[in-house]
């Protein structure tokens, strides 16, 4: 059966196939979760039928090429008509498939804007995980995850739990990586992606891969599923970039339209300061500088408690940057281990992640 969400145009459907390619062979299975973008029930049924046929074809004729199979799912279907936001491959035919990679492929191919997976590495359904939850999202490259990232997480959680009606039991912390962050070399390196995923999962974190380069799009996405509190944790440089008008030229209302979508009623920014490694000067919400033309706009959000400073930080940890740690790992230099959370360096060494080579 089709399930309609609170939004009139949103209908969700689970679909899958359990199959064998040889007699007496254990079953393999492919399951999908789709979200319709069209309103007409008859059209939805026809679209679902077509995608079902494509799934059957893919299962029997493309099971050795699952990435290619994903592309076949949209044969004879308008891409704007349906979104595939979750897919899982299980069984003997797919023993070598990591479903996190297949989720990444959904975003890369434009089949969905965001996917999620849990600490156990299994894919999660965003609609279910985000529904009516308080959300704290921390964006980064996590290449690798450092003490600074973990400090941002812990301090954000501490601030949030002190807020009225925080309800920690109904809250979700998400470590978000954008598609552009995964394409630092111009193309997606799956091994590099899996290295990041393994580290974050080892720390017990829920991970989101998204195509939301702009923060306002991320905020819009969350607001589709929840009306509760949304908190975005970011560094000072990220907040300054948000006030760069070049990101909003595609919007008819420009930066004002974007900020209307970003700083809505229940959203706040938890701001982590930066330090000048040479002078030791700290920059926070009170001392950061934005374009003079936008200064009053920034002050409006600042004085309306939309930007909250993260305090009690470790100034030594603030000098740690993922890119520097990564360079040390690749060059085989010493000293990078103490810049990472407990247990992370051991995992990098044991699994030889991020190009680590034992001497």
Protein language model annotation of sequence segments:
Residues 1-2:
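Short, well-ordered junction/capping motifs at the entry into regular secondary structure
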């Amino acid at each position: 059966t089709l399930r309609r969400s609170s939004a009139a145009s949103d209908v969700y459907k689970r679909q899958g196939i359990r199959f064998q390619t040889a007699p007496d062979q254990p079953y393999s299975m492919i399951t999908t979760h789709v979200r319709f973008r069209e309103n007409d029930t008859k059209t939805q049924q026809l679209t679902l039928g077509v995608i079902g046929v494509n799934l059957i074809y893919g299962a029997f004729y493309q099971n050795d090429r699952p990435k290619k199979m994903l592309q076949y799912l949209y044969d004879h279907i308008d891409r704007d008509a349906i979104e595939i936001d979750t897919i899982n491959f299980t069984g003997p035919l797919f023993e070598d498939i990591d479903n996190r990679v297949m989720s990444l492929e959904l975003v890369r191919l434009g089949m969905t804007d965001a996917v999620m997976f849990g600490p156990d590495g299994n894919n999660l359904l965003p609609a279910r995980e985000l529904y009516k939850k308080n959300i704290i999202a921390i964006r980064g490259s996590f290449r690798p995850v450092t003490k600074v990232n973990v400090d941002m997480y812990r301090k954000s959680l501490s601030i949030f739990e002190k807020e009225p009606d925080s309800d920690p039991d109904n809250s979700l912390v998400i470590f978000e990586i954008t598609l552009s962050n995964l394409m630092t070399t111009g193309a997606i390196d799956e091994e590099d992606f899996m290295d990041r995923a393994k580290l974050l999962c080892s720390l017990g974190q829920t991970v989101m891969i998204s195509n939301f380069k702009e923060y306002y799009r991320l905020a819009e996405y969350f607001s589709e599923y929840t009306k509760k509190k949304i908190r975005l944790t970011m560094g000072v440089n990220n907040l300054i970039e948000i006030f760069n008008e070049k990101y909003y030229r595609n919007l008819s209302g420009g930066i004002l339209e974007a900020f209307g979508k970003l700083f809505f009623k229940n959203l706040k920014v938890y701001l982590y300061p930066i330090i000048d490694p040479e002078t030791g000067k700290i920059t926070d919400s009170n001392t950061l500088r934005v374009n003079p033309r936008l200064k009053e706009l920034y002050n409006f959000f600042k004085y309306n408690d939309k930007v909250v400073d993260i305090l009690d930080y470790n100034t030594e940890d603030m000098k740690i940057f993922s890119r520097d740690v990564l360079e040390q790992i690749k060059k085989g230099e010493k000293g990078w281990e103490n810049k990472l959370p407990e247990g992370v360096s051991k995992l990098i060494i044991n699994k030889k992640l991020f190009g680590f080579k034992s001497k």
